[in-house]
Amino acid sequence: MLLGLSPVRISFAGGGTDMPEYYEKHGGIVITSTINHFTYVIVNKRKDDKFQIFSPDFETHSIAEKINNLSLKKGTELPVSIIKFLNYKKGMNLILSSDVPPRSGLGSSSSLAVNLINVISYLKGSKITKSEIADSSHHVARNILNWPLG
């Protein structure tokens, strides 16, 4: 079993000025800090190709008999997109949890994205820098899922 955790953050000032739609025209500055609340990723590798995801906090449960047959279903968009982006091909049981509710404004989606990229890269045996983790999580959220994240 592998456990990953990543902190969420709170914005003190400048929230929204980190969005390209704003800062490309006006510049931007954000004052944030992480807090002692986290997202959690728990992975159990499987000997078969089955993929199962469960998250009471992100309100999802999904099973695919083969990891190659993953499809985007409501609540699985982020983990499935990251697994496909990283080209991970082995079966797993994936449990996602968070100390804060989705859409709380504390960056739980971004925290979860960073967490998933870090854990799945580790499973693949890939060495990835913090900067690459940040860039990859931003790419998946903004360019693949078209989510408005800063």
Language model: regions and residue ranges:
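ATP-binding N-lobe of GHMP and related small-molecule kinases
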Residues: 1-106, 118-128
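Alpha/beta catalytic cores of group-transfer enzymes, especially the acyltransferase/condensing modules
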Residues: 128-150
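Short, conserved phosphate/pyrophosphate- and ester-handling motifs at nucleotide-, phospho-/glycolipid
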Residues: 109
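Active-site signature of alpha/beta-hydrolase-fold catalytic machinery across serine-
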Residues: 115
